[in-house]
Design a protein with these regions (language model features):
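Glycine/proline-rich low-complexity spacer/linker segments in large multi-domain proteins
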Residues: 5-12, 94, 103-156, 205-214
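Beta-strand elements of well-folded, non-transmembrane domains
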Residues: 26-28, 39-45, 106-108, 161-163
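Ligand-binding face of N-terminal immunoglobulin V-set domains in extracellular IgSF glycoproteins
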Residues: 33-56
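N-terminal, polar/Ser/Thr-rich
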Residues: 1-34, 69, 124-129, 149
C-alpha cells in the first residue's frame, strides 16, 4: 500500500529514518521523562519540513545537520489530532543523509500504552516501574518517530535511571556508567537489527532475573518484580524449548542477541513480541507448576510459544501496513 500525497493517516515518504540514537531519563517520582534523540535520515527530495509522529510530547529543540556539517535550527509544530509533528526549517533540505536532533519531554501515563507507569503493592507500600507498550501506534508517545511498520530502522537506546534499579531493553547492555554525584547511571544498549518502531521496548524498575540459560548462543532469562522468581521455571523451560524448535523449523538463527521475558504487573495485552524483550501480563508468564491447573499451564505455554514465534514472523519479517496484521497473528497462532 503506497499512500498518496493526500492520505491523512500516513506519513510522507520524502524523508525516512535509518538509525535512532535515543536517550531517555524517566522520573518515577514526578511521573515524567526527558529525552534526546539523534536520527539519521535519508531525504529523498528537496523539502523545507520533516513530518513525523509525536503524541503527548513537548518538543523543545530541533536542529538538523548535513553530511558536510552545515546545521539548521528548526521549529516544531504539533498536530494533536493527527499525532504528528511538523519540523520546519528556514532553508530547503537537499536530498541525501542528514542527522536530525530533538530534545523533548513527556509524561509516564497510567493508560498502559506508550511509555507508561505500572504500579504494584509490596509490604513496604506501593511501587512503580516504567514500561512500554508500543503496538500499534504508541511509540510516538515515548519519542518522536516515523511510527509506521514500513519505516524500519536501527535503534540504540540509552536509559538513565537510579543505580538501584534494573533497566532492560531489546538488546544486551553495551556500556554502563555512573553519573557522578547523582546516584544515577546511564545504561547504553547495543544497536538493534533494523526493525519497526512498535517492536522497541524498555523497562525500568526493581526487577529480579532468573538464572540465564543458553539456548544455542542465546542467553534466555525471565524477569519479574522481587519475590516472584520462584514462579519463572515453567515459562523458562517452555521458552527454551520453543526457541530451539523455531530456530530448527525456520532454518534461520534467532534474530536477536538475547531473549528476555518480562512479567509486568500492569499490562493491557496478554503479551507483546518486542524483539529480545518480550513483555507479558504476569498471569501469562508466572506460574507455580506444582499447584497450577492444566489449563493455567497450557495458557502460559501457548502465550510464550506464540510470542517467540513472532521473533521471526512479525519481527524479522513485518507487514508493510496494519492491514497485514491478520497474517502476522494468524501465523504465530498456528505455530503455537
Amino acid at each position: 500500500m503506497n499512500p498518496g500525497p493526500a492520505d491523512p493517516f500516513r506519513l510522507p515518504r520524502t524523508v525516512s529514518p535509518e538509525r535512532y540514537e535515543i536517550r531517555l531519563e524517566p522520573d518515577l517520582e514526578r511521573l515524567t521523562f526527558t529525552g534526546q534523540e539523534m536520527v539519521t535520515v535519508i531525504v529523498r527530495e528537496r523539502v523545507t519540513e520533516v513530518v513525523l509522529n509525536a503524541a503527548e510530547l513537548q518538543i523543545q529543540q530541533v536542529s538538523i545537520r548535513s553530511a558536510t556539517g552545515a546545521t539548521l535550527k528548526g521549529e516544531a509544530t504539533l498536530e494533536e489530532a493527527g499525532e504528528r509533528a511538523r519540523l520546519i526549517f528556514p532553508e530547503p533540505l537537499a536530498p541525501g543523509t542528514w542527522r536530525l536532533s530533538l530534545a523533548f519531554t513527556g509524561i509516564l501515563n497510567d493508560r498502559l500504552h506508550g511509555f507508561y507507569r505500572s504500579t504494584y503493592k509490596t509490604p513496604e507500600g506501593e511501587k512503580i516501574l516504567a514500561a512500554t507498550q508500543f503496538e500499534a501506534t504508541d511509540a510516538r508517545r515515548a519519542f518522536p518517530c516515523w511510527d509506521e511498520p514500513a519505516f524500519k530502522a536501527v535503534f540504540q537506546v540509552t536509559l538513565v535511571a537510579p543505580e538501584r534499579l534494573q533497566v532492560v531493553s531489546n538488546t544486551p547492555v553495551a556500556s554502563e556508567q555512573a553519573i557522578v554525584g547523582t546516584g544515577r547511571k546511564a545504561v547504553t544498549f547495543a544497536p538493534t537489527i533494523k526493525m519497526s518502531t512498535y517492536l522497541l521496548a524498555f523497562v525500568v524498575g526493581e526487577l529480579e532475573a532468573s538464572e540465564p540459560i543458553m539456548v544455542g548462543l542465546t542467553p534466555l532469562r525471565i524477569w519479574s518484580i522481587p519475590g516472584k522468581t520462584h514462579l519463572t521455571a515453567f515459562a523458562r523451560e517452555i521458552a527454551a524449548s520453543s526457541l530451539a524448535f523455531f530456530e530448527q523449523y525456520y532454518g534461520l538463527p534467532y534474530p536477536g542477541e538475547k531473549l528476555d521475558l518480562l512479567a509486568i504487573p500492569d499490562f493491557a495485552a496478554g503479551a507483546m513480541e518486542n524483539l529480545g524483550a518480550i513483555t507479558f501480563r504476569e498471569t501469562a508468564l508466572l506460574v507455580d507448576a506444582g499447584a497450577a491447573s492444566h489449563a493455567e499451564l497450557e495458557r502460559v505455554a501457548d502465550v510464550v510459544a506464540h510470542e517467540i514465534a513472532h521473533m521471526w514472523f512479525g519481527d524479522l519479517v513485518t507487514m508493510a501496513w496494519w492491514n497485514g496484521i491478520w497474517l502476522n497473528e494468524a501465523f504465530a497462532t498456528f505455530m503455537e
